[in-house]
Amino acid sequence: MLIALIAGIVTFILTIIGIPAFIRFYHKARITGQQMHEDVKQHQAKAGTPTMGGTVFLLTSVLASFVIGLFSHQLSNGLIMILFILVLYGVVGFLDDFLKVFRKINEGLNPKQKLFLQLVGGVVFYFFYNQHGAGDQLNIFTVPVQLGFLYVFFVLFWLIGFSNAVNLTDGIDGLASISVVISLVAYAVIAVEQKRFDILIVIISMIGGLLGFFVFNHKPAKIFMGDVGSLALGGMLAAISISLHQEWTLLLIGIVYVFETTSVMMQVTYFKLTGGKRIFRMTPVHHHFELGGLTGHGKEWSEWKVDFFFWGIGIVGSLLTLAILYL
């Protein structure tokens, strides 16, 4: 427990130091920064804001977790698998950001390229996970379900789905970073209950990194995490839920990401079926609230108000999960 707290403190301090240096490098190198293509007027002023800040908290968290795990003899297969997903999905996000920022390719990696790289990471994760006796059992609440060979498809769906879901959530200042902190706190409780102090190290380490990042990412954001951060964080949450054998919990602990992704799917489907009509003003759904409150046609919500609304949903989902598990 103490080792995990040390990892969190180390990562927090390194991120607090690293982010300003990263921002200075960005400005000194005259890098263009974040481009804004959204129809939300409030966001146009953010054009040029440094991005790829996830590189900092990702590197500090992975290094701190690896070194502290190694010296505390907690560098288990479970910890290594989560670090692997963080690194690999972080690399996918880094390539995507690099193409957008440095090569001026607005799309970054195309969907097929991104999916292929995420699939490769997911397949490697599954086979490593399976080789160490994890089995093919999916726990739904307290009911074990044997999936057999289908479990590999579930793992791929879980990793890729939540990786992209957190990416969709990262649309306004501070929203994704604190939403993930809330999710990680819930998984920290589960890890402690299971006495998985190895996994607790990377959980607390990332919490420290995200809190350090939030100092510069809250409104008005001085830096964005970019795909390098959001894709890695989503993959990490999925990997943690799998490693703790509590996969179903991510549907509630990650209810914010589920809500955001579902809103996009509903919008696209309805738009195609009705020949151009919309359910929401704009998706992901946090933009709907920005533009017109709960109904989408009322008074605009500030980014802080949207943040607190979604963080509240995340807290409720996490508390409900813990209540189901332990009460």
Curated annotation (Swiss-Prot):
Which Pfam family name is an example for this entry?
A: Glycos_transf_4
Primary localization class, coarse = membrane
EC assignment: 2.7.8.13
The GO cellular component terms are: plasma membrane
Where is this protein localized, as stated in its record?
Answer: Cell membrane
Q: Which domain of life is it from?
A: Bacteria
Spell out the reaction equation it catalyses: UDP-N-acetyl-alpha-D-muramoyl-L-alanyl-gamma-D-glutamyl-L-lysyl-D-alanyl-D-alanine + di-trans,octa-cis-undecaprenyl phosphate = Mur2Ac(oyl-L-Ala-gamma-D-Glu-L-Lys-D-Ala-D-Ala)-di-trans,octa-cis-undecaprenyl diphosphate + UMP
Report the GO molecular function annotations: metal ion binding; phospho-N-acetylmuramoyl-pentapeptide-transferase activity
InterPro entries from the xrefs?
Glycosyl_transferase_4, PNAcMuramoyl-5peptid_Trfase, PNAcMuramoyl-5peptid_Trfase_CS
Write down the membrane topology.
Multi-pass membrane protein
User: What PROSITE patterns has UniProt attached to this entry?
Assistant: MRAY_2
Per the entry, which co-factors are needed?
Mg(2+)
TM segments?
3-23, 51-71, 75-95, 115-135, 140-160, 172-192, 197-217, 223-243, 248-268, 306-326
Alphabetic keyword roster: Cell cycle, Cell division, Cell membrane, Cell shape, Cell wall biogenesis/degradation, Magnesium, Membrane, Metal-binding, Peptidoglycan synthesis, Transferase, Transmembrane, Transmembrane helix
GO biological process terms on file: cell division; cell wall organization; peptidoglycan biosynthetic process; regulation of cell shape
Pathway(s) per entry: Cell wall biogenesis; peptidoglycan biosynthesis
Family assignment from sequence similarity: Belongs to the glycosyltransferase 4 family. MraY subfamily.
Q: What does this protein do?
A: Catalyzes the initial step of the lipid cycle reactions in the biosynthesis of the cell wall peptidoglycan: transfers peptidoglycan precursor phospho-MurNAc-pentapeptide from UDP-MurNAc-pentapeptide onto the lipid carrier undecaprenyl phosphate, yielding undecaprenyl-pyrophosphoryl-MurNAc-pentapeptide, known as lipid I.
Name of this chain's protein: Phospho-N-acetylmuramoyl-pentapeptide-transferase
Taxonomy, top ranks, is: Bacteria, Bacillati, Bacillota, Bacilli, Lactobacillales
